[in-house]
């Protein structure tokens, strides 16, 4: 399991811890990952994802998982999230078509 957010693509960063005397020590900065279950309103089911705390706030800000995935860029998403995005877009298209007829 990689240390990468499935929704935003945030991953491990490498840098230095710098002391007062300016000595540098290599350090890994890990993302704040959480295992969460999010509700998809369009698919009417729950989805388990491994996301950062920052991504959770973004999902809430955009109005839920469906709205977040529709606006998200494909490059940042994991394979699971890409498949989920396609399923949501198909379901929304299906529900919009009969209403127009």
From Swiss-Prot:
Source organism, top-level taxon: Bacteria
GO annotation terms (biological process): translation
Single GO MF descriptor: structural constituent of ribosome
UniProt keyword list: Ribonucleoprotein, Ribosomal protein
Pfam families per record: Ribosomal_L28
GO terms for cellular component: cytosolic large ribosomal subunit
SUPFAM superfamilies: L28p-like (SSF143800)
Family that this chain belongs to: Belongs to the bacterial ribosomal protein bL28 family.
PANTHER family (alphabetical): 39S RIBOSOMAL PROTEIN L28, MITOCHONDRIAL, LARGE RIBOSOMAL SUBUNIT PROTEIN BL28M
HAMAP family in the cross-refs: Ribosomal_bL28 (MF_00373)
Protein name in UniProt: Large ribosomal subunit protein bL28
Upper taxonomic lineage: Bacteria, Pseudomonadati, Pseudomonadota, Alphaproteobacteria, Hyphomicrobiales
